[in-house]
Amino acid sequence: MGTEKVLVAMSGGVDSSVAAKLLTDAGYDCVGCMMKLYDNEDAGIPKGHTCCSLDDAEDARSVARRLGFPFYVFNLKDKFAACVIDRFVDAYEHGVTPNPCIDCNRYLKFDKLFERADILGCRYIATGHYARVERAGEKYVLKKALDETKDQSYVLYDLTQEKLARVKFPLGSFHKTDAREIAAEAGLCNARKHDSQDICFVPDGDYAKIIAARTGKEPQPGPFLDLSGNVVGTHRGIIHYTVGQRRGLRMPSDGKIYVVRILPEQNAVVVGPDSALYTNECFVANMHWISGEAPAFPYRCSAKTRYRQPERPCTVYPAGQTGVRLVFDEPLRAITPGQSAVLYDGDTVLGGGIIAREAAEC
């Protein structure tokens, strides 16, 4: 087993570099690669907000050289633009709030990596994600990382049995402090490098600028509506808003007002008090079950509706052809269409899907 070939996805950061180090130490025949997804330098994105800049590529190449394996850069900018940036833009134009990191994992970090792995004769691929894969009988299960503060299982819910059989997450049983210590002891150039932050193709969090540049259109103003449907102001375009938002509404109010819903068909934004943000159910479209099979309904488990949010107990019911309805034991605040709902049984990831506005979207 020690001579098996692994394609290691390297970002130039400490996590993927340590993943490569651990695999090399275990005797695997590693091949390093970086996916060039976006011209960070041309967009003026500062260091520390990137994952595939020229400096990142140099760091990854330096690590590969030190560990003694070849390194390649794959140009996937067109694929990234089509499958991540354009989907991101389309979501905001339709009044939902996407998670582009999940699309990047789905369409780039796994689909394209497996294609390249096959070309290079690699049996496995590996990444620096903090998550674990275990075998349970005839099935593979995806589990949270031991370091729950760094756990990334939420963005991996779309993995299939076929992919889990060929993926390795060497950092799943380590803490972040362990990774930095391993990198420092190995003399890796990025042992103290800061983690990348925010969405890699959005400088300074200015989503509207990216959307306008991509579409060539200016956002269209429309009405702010109260919970009764009365016009109470004018918004700057629905791309500027997400459920739960308070800042930037620029409207007079006697109290704290938040975005409650976005109605793209009417180009309207519904606003109301904080209490209007709470609900105990949501619909989830295109539900993916990692085991390949849906459980018997109703099903008890827990779910999280945002990345950095603890999961909450709920009951799962079928909805539509491929969706589910989640009914939480207690109301949750600002469940947001376009985000992912990911289901857990303890530390095991059951699967997930995209939060829909209504049952008809399932």
Task: Describe these PLM feature segments.
Residues 1-157, 168, 177-178, 184:
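ATP-dependent adenylation/nucleotidyltransferase module used to activate substrates
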Residues 126-134, 138-362:
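AMP-forming adenylation/ATP pyrophosphatase catalytic core
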